[in-house]
């Protein structure tokens, strides 16, 4: 039998190789940013690293079906719901950031002071492309692999740490790098919750959320206020939304779980388990019917045995009375013959009585679960109980006939002797 489950060693090796290739390519691709002549806030060349790493891992490692399970492009109702959330959550973060700028900095600038000559449409297209190539590698490929051995929450933590290392910005000081790490980790945790239980349909949700977030950053960074203040606002706002969204999601799922369990424990009328009680009542009724049938069979067996005994006595009396009208010698010979017949009849009647009792006992120990079996057993028992009575009558007639023939023969012999 073929086992399609990915092994623990390959699981770990896939994650390790993906991360190493991604980090190595991000370092090598930095030099190509100036070559292509595109500003870094429009499109980062280093963002191609996760896409290339995912393609290499798919080609190198086996279990292609498992690796490609997170790359489904179909649409479902849940995907549409998460797409709406992927647009709403960045808007909430943007509102919190703008409020923070107004409260703590007294103003905010909608665009950076440099690069204003670039059309907004070019920036939007560039951010969509960046979001697609990054999320293809990290969410559609890597998180799908990690979730084969972990649940979604812990898989999001692992992928979030790797994504934060990949997106680390050490251009400024340590404090800036720390807030940037907080921002990217919170960003990744929100994305992990958004793509939860979408059955591999992750690319649309991840791309939409990523592009919305990165596109919104250009409205909050201000050269006059400083990059440190901007990254603080972005990081804290994203962290607040991440905690709120994930916490609310856990609460809703917990309530749904408790409600479902309570509904299963407190069964209402006409529920799907009512047939259990019906079966118990049916079995109880069948048991009572079987017990009553057994008692009737036992009574019939006893009555049959008594009838056989009475028939035996009648036969003996009849056979004994008929020879008494003849002479002494003839009576002695006839009586001797009848005694022999009676003894054999007594043995046969004893066997018949034993069979009747055994039939009654077999009915008593017969299975009681099936109505058809009970009916067939009752018919067989009645038939077996009727057979001894019929046989008794036939046997009695046979004995009387034999006795009459013997008497006639004896009379003929006596008349011949007298002559």
UniProtKB/Swiss-Prot annotation:
It is a multi-pass membrane protein. Residues 372-382 have a biased composition (Acidic residues). Residues 282-299, 323-353, 383-419 have a biased composition (Basic and acidic residues). One of its GO terms (cellular component) is plasma membrane. GO terms for biological process: CAAX-box protein maturation. It comes from the Bacteria. One of its GO terms (molecular function) is endopeptidase activity. Its main location: membrane. It is found in: Cell membrane; Secreted, Cell wall; Cell septum. Residues 273-419 are annotated as: Disordered. Keywords: Cell membrane, Cell wall, Membrane, Secreted, Transmembrane, Transmembrane helix. The keyword Iron-sulfur does not apply. InterPro entries: Rce1/LyrA-like_dom (IPR003675). The chain crosses the membrane at residues 9-29, 41-61, 84-104, 118-138, 152-172, 175-195, 202-222, 231-251. C-terminal region not involved in glucosaminidase activity of the SagB-SpdC/LyrA complex. Belongs to the LyrA family. Interacts with N-acetylglucosaminidase SagB; interaction is direct and facilitates peptidoglycan processing. Interacts (via N-terminal region including transmembrane domains) with sensor protein kinase WalK (via N-terminal region including transmembrane domains). Interacts (via N-terminal region including transmembrane domains) with sensor protein kinase SaeS. Interacts with other histidine kinases, perhaps via their transmembrane domains. Involved in bacterial cell envelope homeostasis. Regulates peptidoglycan processing by N-acetylglucosaminidase SagB, perhaps acting as a scaffold protein. Pleiotropic regulator of gene expression, probably acting via interactions with multiple two-component systems. Plays a role in the abundant deposition of the immunoglobulin G-binding protein A (spa) at the cross-wall, a subcellular structure that initially arises from cytokinesis. This is Lysostaphin resistance protein A. The lineage of its organism: Bacteria, Bacillati, Bacillota, Bacilli, Bacillales. The gene is lyrA.
